Curated annotation (Swiss-Prot):
Domain remarks: The HXXXXD motif is essential for acyltransferase activity and may constitute the binding site for the phosphate moiety of the glycerol-3-phosphate.
A GO BP entry: phospholipid biosynthetic process
Family: Belongs to the GPAT/DAPAT family.
Extra information: Was identified as a high-confidence drug target.
GO terms for cellular component: peptidoglycan-based cell wall; plasma membrane
Source organism phylogeny: Bacteria, Bacillati, Actinomycetota, Actinomycetes, Mycobacteriales
Alphabetical UniProt keywords: Acyltransferase, Cell membrane, Membrane, Transferase
Name assigned to this protein: Putative acyltransferase plsB1
Subcellular location per the Swiss-Prot or TrEMBL entry: Cell membrane
């Protein structure tokens, strides 16, 4: 047995496995309060007995197994351990100054006095799980227990972390029904005890910088508890954590090129701790509008059309609120400008892209991290210097003026930072492409609102696994608003001449489609091209993705794609997910599979051509 396994299951579990100690089915003096309460609860024992009958197993065997899982996952809050952990957390966070909105904290304190708070946070760093609990305590909110992956429960840190509120849960539990039962019961007991909670709604760290689709497990267990227990409201608190820069990003981007992820262990922790000795700016902690879970469930169930999908809809709502709470960092807009150009720029050229973008962000009433002035030359220069110091950006200053560009093999790192703000820009980018497509395809010289809408909905469908879009009705409303922001459009509900649509795009203060969507469409183009060329009856996903990486490198060298960031395993996997959703991967025996794969490739090639047209229009401005 490895040190990692000992750290995860504990010495007592090890002694049980070798037969020295039996698992106690009654409370122990060392058990956390929730473990004692559950082992003494009649309802818990009755449901365990029913589960044993369902599984055809001996009840005592199931009870012992359940008690072991319960002790494995249950956390406590030992005052001395917590104080020591807080000191360790602050030391590990020393690369950053943490900024928290005081007004948001004041509102949370009011809710904290009367309700349970469940913080669903965006997850970009291992540091998130330390930053949020520390901020909760530092700002005089009730302590929170944090759900985390069992991969972080390694020796010797796991046992300490459990005494500071860390709940380590296994990821793969499909074949462990007793474990799933125990986790559900434990979550219910926590809600019953009005314990504040935190967890990553994404289920793991994003590898791209933008929010991943929500994982429903913890939210489902909390919802089940709310359904069963009469008590105070549980507020889901959308929580955004974003950083100026992160030491971890470079390691994540190597995984995007196909490298194997390193395991979390003591060596990992030492490496992470050493990295934090280099200052990287600020970390920004922001909270979206809290969602009253019990009330929201009642509202949804009152509408019969909403029953059966409550968890999914609430999770998406929470993620939308996280996005809305996420501020734009100067690092994100500088990365956007440099990646879009894919060449070195003077500071004046960077500002030429950033200033109209800043005006657009202001028009959307979106917060800028630290209230930074994105139009200020000093702000942009300082950001460039910080990115040079971390190696993401290179500078050449031996000529007549300094020019900055993305460093060698740093495109995915810069893309990660850009993507922290990309959710703000996606609807605008889609609107630009939809207008262009409608103007291109008109047969009578007129562009109807319905055509623009349909083109936008087609793009939304193409990118639905990549970005978090609003529901259709809200999306159409947002689309109309984006068209109004592009230029002098009086009424988006009336047809317009195609020539006027072209002029609208040509005269726009800023065009974003090429800056926002081109990297993703280029990656999709690689996947679609390779899929159209695929002739084998069987489909080897690992081999296919490896081929995409190789062809992606070729296309990068040939300039068939605009940037190296499109050569990403993460983007390829999402494109393949879309293809599988369209039944273009499996079922290769279908008679029309080759035709439909080619149509898919043509669809993406057309979208890519149009985004390059937008890039050309932007270049002429």
């Amino acid at each position: 047995m490895t040190a990692r396994e000992v750290g995860r299951i504990g010495l007592r579990k090890l002694l049980q496995r070798i037969g020295i100690v039996a698992e106690s089915m009654t409370p122990l003096a060392t058990d956390p309060v929730e473990v004692t309460q559950l082992l003494d609860a009649r309802w818990y024992d009755e449901r365990l007995r029913a589960l044993a009958d369902e599984l055809g197993r001996d009840p005592d065997s199931v009870r012992a197994e359940a008690a072991g899982y319960l002790r494995e996952m249950a956390a406590s809050l030992d005052e001395r351990a917590v104080q020591a952990w807080r000191g360790f957390s602050r030391w590990l966070m020393r690369a950053y100054d943490v900024l928290v909105d005081e007004d948001q904290i004041t509102q949370l304190r009011k809710l904290d006095r009367k309700a349970t708070l469940a913080f669903a946070f965006s997850h970009r760093s291992y540091l998130d799980g330390m930053l949020l609990p520390e901020a909760i305590l530092a700002n005089r909110l009730s302590p929170a227990l944090t759900f985390g992956g069992a991969n972080l429960n390694f020796f010797p840190m796991g046992a300490w972390a459990k005494r500071t509120g860390a709940i380590f849960i296994r990821r793969q539990t499909k074949d462990i029904p007793v474990y799933r039962f125990v986790l559900r019961a434990y979550a219910a007991q926590l809600v019953q005890n009005h314990v504040n909670l935190t967890w990553s709604i994404e289920g793991g760290r994003t590898r791209t910088g933008k929010l991943r689709p929500p994982v429903f497990g913890i939210l489902r267990y909390i919802t089940d508890a709310v359904d069963e227990i009469d008590g105070p409201e549980v507020y889901l608190v959308p929580t955004s954590i974003v950083y100026d820069q992160l030491h971890e990003v470079e390691a994540m981007t190597t995984e995007a090129y196909g490298a194997v992820k390193r395991p979390e262990d003591l060596r990992f922790l030492v490496r992470l701790a050493r990295q934090q000795g280099e200052r990287l700016g600020r970390a920004y902690l922001d909270f979206g509008e809290p969602l009253p879970l019990r009330k929201r469930l009642q509202e949804m169930r009152a509408d019969k059309s909403g029953t059966g999908s409550e968890i999914e809809r609430i999770a998406l709502d929470v993620e939308h609120r996280i996005n809305r709470a996420t501020p734009v960092t100067p690092t994100a807009v500088v990365s956007l400008a440099l990646l879009g150009a894919d060449r070195s720029l003077s500071i004046s050229e960077v500002l030429a892209t950033v200033r109209p973008l800043a005006s657009y962000i202001a028009a959307r009433n979106w917060a800028v991290a630290g209230a930074a002035d994105l139009t200020n030359r000093s702000t942009i220069r300082w950001t460039l210097h910080q990115m040079v110091a971390s190696g993401v950006v290179s500078v050449y200053d031996a000529g007549t003026e300094a020019v900055w560009g993305i460093g060698e093999d740093q495109h995915l790192v810069a893309a990660f930072y850009r993507n922290t703000a990309i959710h703000i820009l996606v609807d605008r980018a889609v609107a630009e492409l939809a207008l262009l497509a409608a103007a291109e395809t008109t047969t009578n010289g007129s562009v109807s609102p319905a055509t623009v809408r349909d083109e936008a909905l087609s793009l939304r469908d193409l990118l639905k696994f990549e970005f978090l879009f609003s529901g259709r009705a809200q999306f159409e409303k947002d689309l109309a608003n984006e068209v109004l922001l592009i230029g002098s459009v009086v009424d988006t509900s009336k047809p317009a001449a195609a020539a006027d649509v072209w002029r609208l795009l040509e005269s726009a203060d800023v065009l974003l489609a090429h800056l926002v969507l081109r990297p993703f469409l280029d990656a999709y183009h690689i996947v679609a091209d390779r899929l159209a060329a695929h002739e084998d009856d069987s489909f080897d996903e690992e081999g296919f993705l490896a081929e995409c990486l190789q062809v992606g490198k070729q296309w990068e060298l040939q300039r068939n794609i605009a940037s190296a960031e499109s050569r990403s395993m993460e983007l390829f996997k999402t494109a393949l997910r879309l293809a599988r959703h369209r039944e273009l991967v499996d079922g290769a025996d279908a008679t029309d599979i080759a035709k439909r794969r080619q149509q898919f490739a043509d669809e993406i090639a057309t979208a890519t051509r149009r985004v390059n047209t937008i890039a050309e229009l932007a270049r002429r401005q």
